[in-house]
Amino acid sequence: MDEMLMITNYSDFLLRSILKKKVARDACLLPWALALLMVSACAAEKVTPSLLEIRPQHEKEWEANPRDVANVLNATAQELWIYFPQRKLPPINVVPKGGPITLFERGPNGEIQIKLNTGKTFWAQYAYQFSHELCHALCDCKPHENPNHWFEESLCETASLFTLRKMAGTWNTAPPYPNWKDYSKSLNAYADERIKLGKLPAGTSFPRWFADNERDMRLNSVDRARNNIVAGVLLPLFEADPKMWEAVTYLNTEKLTKLYSLKQYFEAWSRNSEPRHRAFIASVTKQFDE
């Protein structure tokens, strides 16, 4: 940070010095000084995400090389975590069996506890399940009576699709190991298969489909067929503006009762979010309007 401040201060001094001199004499230096200011400003604005500590547990149950397991889980998490520059999370304990689920209860030292249902070298399945559960942690999931919880489930399904597609691109150029480059195809294929499951019935618009299905989703939030369809609508929004993943931080800020409508739910989300997120939340809300 001190180096950034030194660069910025020097750039300011240089620009002031140039402007005090005759324009004709120093015109050749002015573009250079302006460019330096722009670079230093960008450097000052850049925020490095805090470290995310992921702890694979029950080593033998993974039936895979522990180092490989850790690499896959960390690679998965980073595709989302980079969009939370101000966020901090406690360590995350991950076990391969008993889920997939993110427990409301924390570990003995406040750790987030995630259970998957995977193992061996099914890396695409690791990524799919872990990114979904990590999204619940990022949404600050907690015990609730919220009948709109289906939206969080759909949002976390969106996170899985987003992560798989991002990882495929990353691994195609910078895999954890050089010989893992071809796994990028498996990641893409896994995402494509899930996206196909989320296709709307022919001739049906999403608002019409939602009007016909909302009641059932309020009664059963974990309905993967319906969650997939909602995720298919949300995915293009997040891929167009991935910085907006940060907005899920505020999804559960307000304690909601079982009487909340979807409109009230979105209003609470927007109200508790940062101003920079509200236009995006409005665009999400609009998808559900007839």
Feature locations, PLM:
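Auxiliary, metal-adjacent structural segments of Zn-dependent hydrolase domains
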Residues: L52-T121
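N-terminal secretory signal peptides that target proteins for export/translocation
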Residues: M1-A24
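Post-HExxH zinc-binding segment in Zn-dependent metallohydrolases
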Residues: H149-I195
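Bacterial N-terminal signal peptides
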Residues: L29-V39
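Active-site recognition of the HExxH zinc-binding catalytic motif
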Residues: Y128-H144, E157
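Bacterial Sec-dependent signal peptides at the C-terminal "C-region" and cleavage site
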Residues: V39-V47
